């Protein structure tokens, strides 16, 4: 047994499924973060959704999985500096979940769909690396079954220990991935869009692979305001159409202010069943420095008094957006104090629609805010 409390199991279960209708048939990779809850914590939490019993495994495979998870849960001290415990939990540690969600039409099922998620749990906030890993593992697992998971477990056992500041090479189902690990809270330079299959172009482990310039496509002029809010520990609610969009947005905001640590708590994908829901949402005033990513429109009503609310769009040209696409906007109660770099912004607005310029534009934008934070 891995020593996961009932509260953590509930959180893992609810966090691993989109809290919105994303598509009829398709898959989605996203990430989330939940607080570790001590095993002796109160059991007063929402019930987890019913799930079929997991397939039986041989003792050797179970033992191997325990060892592989111990690697994925290693190096807690290299995680982003966390806030003090809140309300229900006495823990200051977090679990990161990297999820592959699959949905297919299936008329034989009561709801008409086959829906399952495969999740990698880790104490390491390496969103860039683990998104690449789960994106390879998920499709293979759902096509070939447990034999893929067993092969992956044996791969993980052979992974070297993650050393901050170095490039890590790991095998994933026959593919060798190279990832540049951050040195503490230092910013990682580059565009963050590499697949990691080349040692000369490694994955930036702490940076989402979806470009910053694409995630905030319609809101590029507002990045200066968001950067300022992150530095001054202002509460921010981010609402998007799916958990990949919101989780990438939150991760990018965390990356935007490196090497300054996040002053409060951040949740890339947050839902109403989270163990800390009351601590964040039902208070008269939101906690200082908390950043929540959500897909449920319920949060727009419940958190209407928050000082900064971001609604994300599709991340592409208006001509490609349908009627149901939400209008991208930021509602903020404070006045921006930092001046925009209008020259850079004008250039970014030209680059964002050019596929050949996307990598360069993303690298320039990330470098700009890294330098701005260092001043």
Residue ranges, per PLM feature:
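Acidic, Ser/Thr/Pro/Gly-enriched alpha-helical scaffold modules and adjacent low-complexity linkers
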Residues: 1-375
């Amino acid at each position: 047994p891995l020593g996961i409390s009932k509260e953590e199991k509930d959180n893992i279960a609810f966090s691993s499924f989109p809290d919105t209708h994303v598509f009829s048939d398709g898959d989605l990779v996203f990430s989330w973060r939940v607080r570790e809850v001590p095993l002796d914590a109160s059991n007063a939490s929402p019930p987890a959704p019913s799930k079929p019993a997991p397939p039986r495994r041989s003792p050797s495979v179970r033992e191997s999985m325990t060892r592989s998870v111990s690697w994925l849960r290693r190096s807690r001290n290299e995680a982003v500096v966390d806030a003090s415990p809140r309300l229900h939990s006495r823990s200051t540690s977090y679990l990161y979940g990297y999820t592959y969600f699959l949905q297919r039409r299936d008329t034989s099922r009561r709801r008409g769909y086959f829906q399952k998620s495969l999740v990698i749990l880790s104490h390491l906030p390496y969103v860039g690396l683990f998104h690449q890993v789960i994106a390879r593992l998920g499709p293979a697992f759902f096509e070939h079954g447990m034999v893929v998971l067993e092969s992956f477990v044996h791969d993980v056992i052979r992974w070297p220990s993650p050393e901050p500041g170095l490039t890590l090479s790991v095998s994933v189902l026959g593919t060798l991935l190279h990832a540049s690990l951050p040195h503490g809270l230092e910013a990682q330079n580059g565009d963050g869009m590499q697949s990691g299959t080349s040692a000369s172009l490694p994955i930036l482990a702490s940076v989402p692979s979806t470009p910053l310039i694409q995630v905030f496509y319609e809101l590029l002029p507002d990045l200066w305001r968001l950067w300022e809010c992150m530095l001054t520990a202002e509460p921010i609610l981010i609402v998007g159409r799916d958990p990949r969009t919101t989780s990438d947005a939150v991760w990018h905001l965390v990356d935007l202010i490196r090497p300054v640590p996040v002053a409060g708590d951040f949740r890339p994908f947050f839902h109403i069943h989270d163990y800390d829901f009351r601590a964040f949402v039902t208070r008269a005033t939101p906690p200082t420095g908390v950043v929540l990513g959500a897909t449920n429109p319920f949060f727009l009503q419940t958190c209407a008094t928050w000082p900064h609310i971001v609604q994300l769009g599709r991340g592409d040209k208006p001509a490609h957006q349908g009627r149901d696409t939400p209008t991208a906007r930021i509602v903020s109660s404070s006045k921006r104090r930092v001046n925009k770099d209008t020259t850079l912004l004008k250039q970014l607005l030209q680059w964002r629609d050019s596929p050949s310029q996307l990598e360069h534009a993303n690298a320039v934008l990330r470098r700009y805010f890294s330098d701005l934070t260092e001043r």
